[in-house]
Amino acid sequence: MKTIIALSYIFCQVLAQNLPGNDNSTATLCLAHHAVPNGTLVKTITNDQIEVTNATELVQSSSTGRICDSPHRILDGKNCTLIDALLGDPHCDGFQNEKWDLFVERSKAFSNCYPYDVPDYASLRSLVASSGTLEFINEGFNWTGVTQNGGSYACKRGPDNSFFSRLNWLYKSESTYPVLNVTMPNNDNFDKLYIWGVHHPSTDKEQTKLYVQASGRVTVSTKRSQQTIIPNVGSRPWVRGLSSRISIYWTIVKPGDILLINSNGNLIAPRGYFKIRTGKSSIMRSDAPIGTCSSECITPNGSIPNDKPFQNVNKITYGACPKYVKQNTLKLATGMRNVPEKQTRGIFGAIAGFIENGWEGMIDGWYGFRHQNSEGTGQAADLKSTQAAIDQINGKLNRVIEKTNEKFHQIEKEFSEVEGRIQDLEKYVEDTKIDLWSYNAELLVALENQHTIDLTDSEMNKLFEKTRRQLRENAEDMGNGCFKIYHKCDNACIGSIRNGTYDHDVYRDEALNNRFQIKGVELKSGYKDWILWISFAISCFLLCVVLLGFIMWACQKGNIRCNICI
């Protein structure tokens, strides 16, 4: 019985040697591109989702959680608002003459001096923030006939009643308050910012007690402007034990101009001026901590890297920042179209080319060759076509960043309640800009992705056509990215095809002869190999069944005896 089974096995092996796929006079050469098991989906102009081997995320969606103190000079407002620091609130004295690129206002900031309001708060805040300094110069104003340096228990500096350090509260001297008429020329070559105010007593009694006159008036003029303020006497909500208020105003005096102050009462006078500088300093409301790190881009959420062209962390930014978009993700293709390799290629592991799928594990190149010949199988990358594709894809990310990064800051915009319609319009414009940029970003990335995929497909086709031109009639295009070579082609021959030194004339006669011989016996169906192997397997199976049947019949008749020993 053992002899019969052994003979059957030998017979099947002999038949297998005569199948066309094992003919040593031919070889198979396939071309394909790199593939990965799990690619990345990107969007192109023609396809919402197409898989590529590699892609780079273009949207920065998270911050560091802290504001970096470099390269920008960050000034932490702590418990002080910028306006309180400007006026000289006692608990903000540490900010005198400070400079910054970005002033960070905290939600915990508070005022701790005489209650005040600023009718044009947003404009003053923006002006001082962009100036980037609280540098203050005292001037010798001549306030004759009045008492200076008024203070209040609502504004303590240590244990003493005090006032804003940059303002001078004037009130009557003995029982008189003369008309004040003071001028101050600007003989320097820069703009000067003067901060002044008007006191609004809570009662008529307080008005006459401080300023004698029942109604005061303050007029501040330059050659270009004039402001006249009449105090509004009356009670207001109590703040820090007071129902009176101070209104803060400001005047810019240009070089060569003159500041003129005229008043018969209620004047909160300036002590000097602030230097106004032009620059790109700014202010931001944020509760993010300030850390020791470096980042060009700052948002209220914290600093973010600017190595991506887009971000959706916050609309408010400072520095060289990615463009704000609504999308959470935009992926830029930096690899080729991905067609994962099929895990099984038939019973005998046939190879296939790029028409069917890519190849995994090709780490030394994007495009390459696989071959099957009398010496076995092998694989090699084509470095020239790989480098051609990489050279064109490299730099895509940098080019997109250059097109989109803002080299300026997007400041916070504030409006008073009376400017509500302007605020609504500004919000509409900002939202429209964001919508437009979000659409443009998606379109830009889709165009770049389309170009990348078309480019990598083109390099694959170029390599295939180059190989076809070398082989000519010595091989047949199998329609799946492979060539059936009709002559014996060892590894040296395969290498010459890869490096472009293959001479088809050397193998022409052998190839033509083999082509005609093989064509005479090959099936024309696309499933010829499958049919041959299935027929072979069925034949072997039937042969074994017949032999086993014969053995069982012989045993039953007593012609063969089987002994089973344990």
UniProtKB/Swiss-Prot annotation:
It is found in: Virion membrane; Host apical cell membrane. Disulfide bonds join 30-482, 68-293, 80-92, 113-155, 297-321, 489-493. One of its GO terms (biological process) is fusion of virus membrane with host endosome membrane. GO terms for molecular function: host cell surface receptor binding. Residues 552-566 are cytoplasmic. Keywords: Clathrin- and caveolin-independent endocytosis of virus by host, Clathrin-mediated endocytosis of virus by host, Disulfide bond, Fusion of virus membrane with host endosomal membrane, Fusion of virus membrane with host membrane, Glycoprotein, Hemagglutinin, Host cell membrane, Host membrane, Host-virus interaction, Lipoprotein, Membrane, Palmitate, Signal, Transmembrane, Transmembrane helix, Viral attachment to host cell, Viral envelope protein, Viral penetration into host cytoplasm, Virion, Virus endocytosis by host, Virus entry into host cell. InterPro entries: Capsid_hemagglutn (IPR008980), Hemagglutn_HA1_a/b_dom_sf (IPR013828), Hemagglutn_influenz_A (IPR000149), Hemagglutn_influenz_A/B (IPR001364). The record marks 345-346 as: Cleavage. GO terms for cellular component: host cell plasma membrane; membrane; viral envelope; virion membrane. Its main location: virion. The chain crosses the membrane at residues 531-551. The keyword Transmembrane helix applies. It comes from the Viruses. Residues 1-16 form the signal peptide. A lipid is attached at residues 555, 562, 565 (S-palmitoyl cysteine). Belongs to the influenza viruses hemagglutinin family. Binds to sialic acid-containing receptors on the cell surface, bringing about the attachment of the virus particle to the cell. This attachment induces virion internalization of about two third of the virus particles through clathrin-dependent endocytosis and about one third through a clathrin- and caveolin-independent pathway. Plays a major role in the determination of host range restriction and virulence. Class I viral fusion protein. Binds to sialic acid-containing receptors on the cell surface, bringing about the attachment of the virus particle to the cell. This attachment induces virion internalization either through clathrin-dependent endocytosis or through clathrin- and caveolin-independent pathway. Plays a major role in the determination of host range restriction and virulence. Class I viral fusion protein. Responsible for penetration of the virus into the cell cytoplasm by mediating the fusion of the membrane of the endocytosed virus particle with the endosomal membrane. Homotrimer of disulfide-linked HA1-HA2. This is Hemagglutinin.
